[in-house]
Amino acid sequence: MRAVLVIGASRGIGLEFVRQYRAAGDRVLATARDDAGLQRLRDLGATAIKLDVSDPASVSGLAWQLDGEQIDIALYVAGVYSQTGADTPPTQQEFDKLMHTNVLGAMQAIPQVAPLVAQARQGKGGKFVFITSGMAQIGSVESSFGWTYRVSKAALNMAVASAQPDYPKVIMVAMSPGWVRTDMGGAGAALSVEESVSAMRRAIDGLTPKHKGAFLQHDGEPFSSW
């Protein structure tokens, strides 16, 4: 039985990761920021941890909540979205919300969680996956749609790639879920939540040291550029 940690699991992709890993017989620890989200996690049989990734004080206490754990697979799924383009200056509130959740939360989690992932499999190490977006790919930008969101996810990719050398036993990747039918992706998206998460789970199982620090699609294939 593997130990799986899902950070940002109250709904959508995060909740589906919890559902699928629990169905596979894995032990799952998962975070949510409110009571309703925590109850959804408990209903799936997960160990629910209260955490608000947009609040640095909340994230700073993650390590003691995970004390003694060895994590085979950790996933940072938490994220917020904005559609605003470059024709409108981002507000301070919008910028701070996206950067705190999408970037700072992940950067705070890495030093607390990565050492626990390194201890997995009798010290051989596990996998730490950060859910990013294809909209972060600088080499294929065709629009400023989601301007601040794009910037935040590109920053997340760099946070992952630059943290990787400090944790040689851990395979750290930034993985896009694809265009998914969630509150963020909309009803017209190509993939259901179930399809996206199933594909990502297969890709995660197939990760090897050659993938360290990589920017991957939901099927595990690398993007053509950063």
Predicted segments — roles?
Residues 21-39:
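Conserved glycine-rich Rossmann-like NAD(P)H-binding loop of the short-chain dehydrogenase/reductase
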Residues 10, 14-20:
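N-terminal Rossmann NAD(P)H-binding glycine-rich loop of SDR-like oxidoreductase domains
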Residues 53-69:
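Conserved Rossmann-fold cofactor-binding substructure of NAD(P)-dependent oxidoreductases
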Residues 42-57:
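Rossmann-fold cofactor-recognition segment
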Residues 174-177, 186-226:
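C-terminal helical subdomain
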Residues 7, 71-79, 130, 173:
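Rossmann-fold scaffold of SDR-type NAD(P)-dependent oxidoreductases
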Residues 58-61, 105-112:
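Conserved mid-core alpha-helix of short-chain dehydrogenase/reductase
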Residues 80-99, 103-107, 118-165:
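Catalytic loop of short-chain dehydrogenase/reductase
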